[in-house]
Amino acid sequence: GKVRLGFHQVTRPEGNNTLEDYASNARGMNVIVPTWFNVVSSDGTYTSLASKDYVDKAHDMGLKVWAMVENVSTEESVKNLNTKTLMSSTSTRKKLIEKLMNEADTYGFDGFNLDFESLKAEAGPHYVQFIREMSVACRNKGLVLSVDNYVPSSYTAFYNRKEQGIVADY
């Protein structure tokens, strides 16, 4: 069926308690993307607002949960994270992906949504490689992988949407 997705901005743990209010105003929505994982440093460290109760409640409401992994929602991530450094290291990518797959096991959500913004061109190929590797890990676990992108333009061509379209589900 069609994906009718809504983003749920969760900025602190209490934000998870607003799922029912939020979803009640979004008739027809069948996927919710809570903003749970903020990558805050170039070694792949991230903060988590994930909640098993949220996932269980969403599932009871007939919603799939695709947890967002992003790099821009906090001052800490904007200040400390060099995405090229993070993404250009094979071992760091592998460690980050393994940790994220463990989160999926722990919380029981249905997929991931990647939202990496403000990348510099030199980070582009490494980010695409991360998406490839994340795609394999997600497929092995039966998880969906979706990627958020800018409107296509010449100055964001390095996001390589064509390759993303091959390896990501959405």
Which functions belong to the PLM regions below?
Residues N25-A26, V167:
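Short, conserved loop/helix-junction motifs that constitute active-site signature segments
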Residues G1-G6, N16-N25:
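Non-catalytic propeptide/linker segments at domain boundaries
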Residues K2-P13, N38-Y170:
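Chitinase-like catalytic core of GlcNAc-active glycosidases
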